[in-house]
Curated annotation (Swiss-Prot):
The keyword rRNA-binding applies. It comes from Bacteroides fragilis (strain ATCC 25285 / DSM 2151 / CCUG 4856 / JCM 11019 / LMG 10263 / NCTC 9343 / Onslow / VPI 2553 / EN-2). Binds together with bS18 to 16S ribosomal RNA. Signal peptide: none annotated. Transmembrane segments: none annotated. It comes from the Bacteria. The keyword rRNA-binding applies. This is Small ribosomal subunit protein bS6. GO terms for molecular function: small ribosomal subunit rRNA binding; structural constituent of ribosome. InterPro entries: Ribosomal_bS6, Ribosomal_bS6_sf, Ribosomal_S6_plastid/chlpt, Transl_elong_EF1B/ribsomal_bS6. GO terms for cellular component: cytoplasm; ribonucleoprotein complex; ribosome. Keywords: Ribonucleoprotein, Ribosomal protein, RNA-binding, rRNA-binding. The lineage of its organism: Bacteria, Pseudomonadati, Bacteroidota, Bacteroidia, Bacteroidales. Gene3D superfamilies: 3.30.70.60.
């Protein structure tokens, strides 16, 4: 199993309920394929660097997970088919990226406790 991180941008015309529904759909796909979700972050509505599909903002989502390489093809196929997703990027984390992500999560959880 490899550790992956995926960031996807949802169209800004979605309501909060629709956005959460889309995120749950992709998390469900991962879990159905046997992936273990490590972390999930909603980065909120952000301005895009350049317009995509005539939209200048989007809802950013990050999901970190452990999965077999075959799961990525199924996940990305669903990203491509879903018109709510305007961009996505999935990459395999090496040991340094995984350590950094764990450190970042622990710092973030410490800030929440304060």
């Amino acid at each position: 199993m490899n550790q992956y991180e995926t960031v996807f941008i949802l169209t800004p015309v979605l309501s909060d309920v629709q956005m959460k529904e889309a995120v749950e759909k992709f998390k469900g796909i991962l879990q159905a394929e046997g992936a273990e979700i490590i972390n999930e972050e909603n980065w909120g509505l952000k301005k895009l660097a350049y317009p995509i599909q005539k939209k200048s903002t989007g809802f950013y989502q990050l999901i970190e997970f452990n999965a077999e390489p075959t799961v990525i093809d199924k996940l990305e196929l669903n990203f491509r088919r879903d018109e709510r997703v305007i961009r996505f990027l999935t990459f395999r984390m090496d040991k340094y990226a995984a350590e950094y992500a764990a450190k970042r999560r622990s710092v973030k959880s410490n800030k929440k406790e304060d």
